[in-house]
């Protein structure tokens, strides 16, 4: 059985992330969205809320589960019995970092392969950072995130 781990901070989860998960759910038996605590990134939403939002966005996919974690990704992959890391590449600028990360993960978890997917064209420009920035300034984010995420951001930045 192929069990893929899709790690990230997901602060917040976007339609781009959701697109990757939907496509992965057709390619793999099981998809685990691994929401990283990432305290050094000082996330906008607490881990529990990011996990809940990811669950809401993916609840229609029966072979997808969402789990929060705060350990080394290689260790978490072993705990989850994952055999693939899934990463998204929006642009060439993402590749160098992701390539370095994949090589490090290969050293730490040699039995887990790294697989890169590019986003659908309509989502290739979306990033959590840009979504947060637009929301902070009161812009319309509904084209970029699930309604539950838009609601959470609206509540967070009420003026």
UniProtKB/Swiss-Prot annotation:
The keyword Metal-binding does not apply. Gene3D superfamilies: HUPs. InterPro entries: Cyt_trans-like, PPAT, Rossmann-like_a/b/a_fold. The record marks 17 as: Transition state stabilizer. Pathway: Cofactor biosynthesis; coenzyme A biosynthesis; CoA from (R)-pantothenate: step 4/5. It is found in: Cytoplasm. GO terms for biological process: coenzyme A biosynthetic process. One of its GO terms (molecular function) is ATP binding. It holds the Pfam family CTP_transf_like. ATP binds at residues 9-10, 17, 88-90, 98, 123-129. The keyword Magnesium applies. It catalyses: (R)-4'-phosphopantetheine + ATP + H(+) = 3'-dephospho-CoA + diphosphate. Substrate binds at residues 9, 41, 73, 87. Keywords: ATP-binding, Coenzyme A biosynthesis, Cytoplasm, Magnesium, Nucleotide-binding, Nucleotidyltransferase, Transferase. Signal peptide: none annotated. Its EC number is 2.7.7.3. GO terms for cellular component: cytoplasm. Its cofactor is Mg(2+). Belongs to the bacterial CoaD family. Reversibly transfers an adenylyl group from ATP to 4'-phosphopantetheine, yielding dephospho-CoA (dPCoA) and pyrophosphate. Homohexamer. PANTHER family: PHOSPHOPANTETHEINE ADENYLYLTRANSFERASE. This is Phosphopantetheine adenylyltransferase. The lineage of its organism: Bacteria, Pseudomonadati, Pseudomonadota, Gammaproteobacteria, Pseudomonadales.
């Amino acid at each position: 059985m192929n069990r893929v781990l899709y790690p990230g901070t997901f602060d917040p989860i976007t339609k781009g992330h959701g697109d990757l998960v939907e496509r992965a759910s057709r390619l793999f038996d099981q998809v685990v969205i691994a929401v990283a605590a990432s305290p050094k990134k000082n996330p906008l939403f607490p881990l529990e809320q990011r996990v809940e939002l990811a669950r809401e966005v993916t609840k229609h996919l029966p072979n997808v589960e969402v789990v929060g974690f705060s350990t080394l990704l290689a260790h978490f992959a072993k705990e989850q019995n994952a055999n693939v890391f899934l990463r998204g590449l929006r642009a060439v600028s993402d590749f160098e970092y992701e390539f370095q990360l994949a090589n490090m993960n290969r050293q730490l978890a040699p039995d887990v392969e790294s697989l890169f997917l590019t986003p659908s064209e309509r989502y290739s420009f979306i990033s959590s950072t840009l979504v947060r920035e637009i929301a902070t300034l009161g812009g319309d984010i509904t084209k970029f995130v699930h309604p539950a995420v838009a609601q959470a951001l609206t509540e967070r930045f009420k003026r």
